[in-house]
Amino acid sequence: MEEEDESRGKTEESGEDRGDGPPDRDPALSPSAFILRAIQQAVGSSLQGDLPNDKDGARCRGLRWRRCCRSPRSEPRSQESGAADTATVLDTAADSFLVELVSILDPPDTWVPSRLDLQPGESEDMLELVAEVRIGDRDPMPLPVPSLFPRLRAWRTGKTVSPQSHASRPACSRHLTLGTGDGGPAPPPAPSSASSSPSPSPSSSSPSPPPPPPPPPPPALPAPRFDIYDPFHPTDEAYSPPPAPEQKYDPFEPTGSNPSSSAGTPSPEEEEEEEEEEEEEGLSQSISRISETLAGIYDDNSLSQDFPGDDSPRREPPPPQTLGAPGTPPQADSTRAEGAPRRRVFVLGPEAEACHEGKVSVEVVTAGAPALSLPPLPPTDPEIEEGEIVQPEEEPRVAVSLFRAARPRQPPASVATLASVAAPAAPPASAPRAPEGDDFLSLHADSDGEGALQVDLGEPPAPPAADARWGGLDLRRKILTQRRERYRQRSASPGPPPARKKARRERQRSGDPAPPDSPSWEAKKHRSRERKLGSHSTARRRSRSRSRRRSRSRSADRRRGGHRSRSREKRRRRRRSASPPPAASSSSSSRRERHRGKRREGGKKKKKRSRSRAEKRSGDLEKLPASVPPSGSDRDSRRRGAVPPSIQDLTDHDLFAIKRTITVGRPDKAEPRAPSPAPAVSPKREVLYDSEGLSADERGGKSDKDRRRSGAASSSSSSREKGSRRKALDGDRGRDRDRSSKKTRPPKDSTPGSGPLPKAPPSSGSSSSSSSCSSRKVKLQSKVAVLIREGVSSTTPAKDSSSSGLGSIGVKFSRDRESRSPFLKPDERAPAEVAKVAPGSNKPKKTKAKAKAGAKKAKGTKGKTKPSKTRKKVRSGGSSTASGGPGSLKKSKADSCSQAASAKGTEETSWSGEERTTKAPSTPPPKVAPPPPALTPDSQTVDSSCKTPEVSFLPEEASEDTGVRVGAEEEEEEEEEEEEEEEQQPATTTATSTAAAAPSTAPSAGSTAGDSGAEDGPAARISQLPTLPPPMPWNLPAGVDCTTSGVLALTALLFKMEEANLASRAKAQELIQATNQILSHRKPSSTLGVTPAPVPTSLGLPPGPSSYLLPGSLPIGGCGSTPPTPTGLAPASDKREGSSSSEGRGDTDKYLKKLHTQERAVEEVKLAIKPYYQKKDITKEEYKDILRKAVHKICHSKSGEINPVKVSNLVRAYVQRYRYFRKHGRKPGDPPGPPRPPKEPGPPDKGGPGLPLPPL
């Protein structure tokens, strides 16, 4: 991270020094001269200074060329590109532009072909060409040649030379880094690039070594980078020929630089030729070409170049822009990226011109160095495309759409070759996408049918032309274009300042929407975008970009290991801590934090570790490195979460991982396009890979469901889901929340039966809840509901996504409730939470949406969360997160068991409402009314691994599966947040706990939950709150259905309630104690599925504890007798007390564990008994007795294990015994407890203390 930061800083400095900052630009220099100089210097320095430049070296895993190009319109802050790349790129891409640049820059001095030649595949890392063109003032780009040259030369000379780096960093926003997107072999400085390539790549773009050759070394390894092949982006093929300067680079100079360096250091002559051509054509043309090239490069390269090992906050902005303009550049980049995820991010956009000072930033990111994201242009284009990973509000990077006009420039044959190579190896999307490079405006992290994540760079203009290309290859672009169209349709009303995040996201996603706030665009617009409903298109684009980035980040994370996760975690924490301070900002930052938290959770769930690392790393990088380019404060603000980490967190690694793992069904994508106008439904096609059943219907309606399911069909790539989901969560959270809550929420409620909404997955962060049915936990392992939506309208993360079923992959990221609450409160509360609003407007929980509380938590749009009914067992993980909330989700402690798979969505909803409302622990009005219906724990085995006692089991009485415990355990940070929210929903929690305690009527639910849990278990959090069929809203006073409330309440409640609603808990304790006294003697205590209604749900918060409070024998749900009165739901500060007071179960964790064990035991016993019961070997009464006794025995076994074999043996012994008794006229019920079953003591070896046996 530091390395990335340094590189970034250096990049900024180089940009500023070279360009003297946007203000300091040399008026004397003509724009073309400026750009040429910048490019030349960048290339030269990149060649010599890739590794030499310490920061840039960090940036350039391999050599990285930085060119500072200033065009009248765009002033490339610093263009880093391998010499070969630059030459090739310049020659291929922007002949005139390059020629101008070359002429201005001293080609011989700047270009150091020797470096490239040095170690074509080894030293020099693959470089990713990231170009950021800021267009604003075209005129003097005071990129002082002298300053540029010295820096470039210094950089070339020594990898630690900071001059260029420094210049680049100050000018971070404007620096153009042309790197060999190809990640050609790092030049001799490769050591530095190598070191950074593994994980530093502070500057995602700079990390790309200026590899004159474009070897596709493995992203992590400078030389290996080109060895590492990106399955989705056959960069290897393109990269394999490192010496193909002209081939690598396409008509667009920025992109060409990347491929060129990969192909081989373009000779200065080539660059000069390009410069000449550029001068002839003029800066605008050159810029358009660059943008086109960038778009082309980005199309495939960016996606393909996910630096698994690179933390490239900087890179984050660029990676999304992977549209291949002609397809070659992206492919070339992609080709190189294959080996080493290399991101070429070119942000060139006339649209952003107004807001941007004329700046062209071309960043070449090494596969291993994602850190160097393009420095955001603070005032730059309002429409930061999704394609570009936009820095948070602080350093909005212009994801300006590359000039579509530049499109005429087709990649040269060599570039085309690269594209073709990349396309074959990579999903077809790569090659076809290239032609649409001009549309790279919005880069969405879409995955091709082949599973390659690709960024759509095309705007609406591109779709017709792109359609042919889109057929197999440009799906992303096509989707992106449609998104843009939708966004434009809706963008007119994007949004109020609250939409700041959204606005930013939208800008990133679609260059069009955010022009107005371009200056404050960084922070405010991002937030507004996040919130804006209208900015669905941009949200989608951003989601895509995010998912891609995230995917890459994940990939890198896997390669890098925990490094990224650690840094990301730190950054997230920083964000969390930082975001609260500003008041207005605090809500948006809270939202951001929430999203980040969710993302964090999502990362853990999806990649379990690798994703979590990627997320953390991405978040960190995006937070720190991403903001580094603009300034330290920018970085800090990013950390704070000025922009939801959705994009920020998506590093190249993440995107790469997403690209690799997430496959979006093209047909689905194409289909959703038609609905593109529909902001809520149409914009998103949510393909929740993990949670196919993720209430797509609920979220987007039944069509959504179908789409989602189709998406689920393609959801085989859970990795993608992870990345996409993260992105979607981040970017879509606000929009999706708003839109889903408002627009789709009613549909969701209307279609509670539909599978759980993706919302659950976001909340679960693992999208485990996304599975509409337990059967639908298709990709639960990824634990992330990847919403594949054409439009990533953040406001309608799940619902819209499902409705539109558009091809874009919106990744819903679980965020902390804090960050989510701003979104959740208004939309979710108002729309589908009327009933819940009564309990507390602040914690209005969408009845059905709340059922998806997990998703809501993750997504911040609980309303969006699948309805409780829909969500039943959707995704164990997702559902659980409802209560866990973003933080809870993150906790995948209970997640491992994913008992929450069938957790009630309603519970989730209640949670989400509180989450939204009560950010601060303000014991909100406890949701006194506990779910009266006794919910059987459904053998939703609470994860024993649950760290937090938040895991709640919500046996839904209606659906056997639905009552899966939501072991949504949030990380402690998030737990605190959750607890705060729980204060608001103490009653809900109680209800949920009660439901959990309620006899687990549906062992199958438990089983499904268990399955989900298996997938989710690895997930960071237990977002396993599947919405239970009961769509009962979490009305605080009314009391939520035990089924829905149990899971969520237990999850969030156990921890949050404990801390936030102690008073409520005390009351709950009293109630539980009373119930305990009554029921503690009854072994079928909490799992008495028979008594679903009388659950002491009155303790909204205590429910979780109450379940646990039961000494294990007291069934919370079972004690249906306990009135659902808001007993002590009022925040009695004894929440914790309640749990501890109940039979010394002071430890909520213990209770949760016991409940979990008991539920699992019930599930196992039911499974074992079923055959006998079906054969009528035993009667119903005997069945109940055996179930109760067996569960009791298992729970009290010394081993504490639940061994299915032992359980079956025990059950068989009981059945035989009962049969024997029946034969001999003795009553089977006579023997108290398991009457001498063969394996009495350890039959199931359920170590759970005498949990109340839930007799069925």
UniProtKB/Swiss-Prot annotation:
Q: Where is the composition biased (Low complexity)?
A: 192-206, 412-424, 752-775, 793-804, 985-1017
Q: Which residues carry this modification: Phosphotyrosine?
A: 689
Give the gene name: Scaf1
What is a biological process (GO) this protein takes part in?
transcription by RNA polymerase II
Give residue numbers for the modification (Phosphoserine).
240, 442, 447, 491, 493, 510, 518, 520, 577, 579, 676, 682, 691, 695, 819, 821, 876, 883, 910, 912, 939
Biased segments, Basic and acidic residues type: 7-27, 227-236, 612-623, 696-709, 719-741, 813-831, 1133-1152
Query: What residue spans carry the Pro residues bias annotation?
Result: 207-222, 922-935, 1244-1256
Phosphothreonine modification, residue list: 328, 663, 923, 936, 948
Protein name as catalogued: Splicing factor, arginine/serine-rich 19
The segments labelled Necessary for interaction with the CTD domain of POLR2A in the record are 1131-1256
Primary localization class, coarse: nucleus
| Polar residues composition bias: residue spans | 255-265, 938-947
The keyword Ubl conjugation belongs to this UniProt entry's keyword annotation = yes
Q: Which GO terms describe its cellular component?
A: nucleus
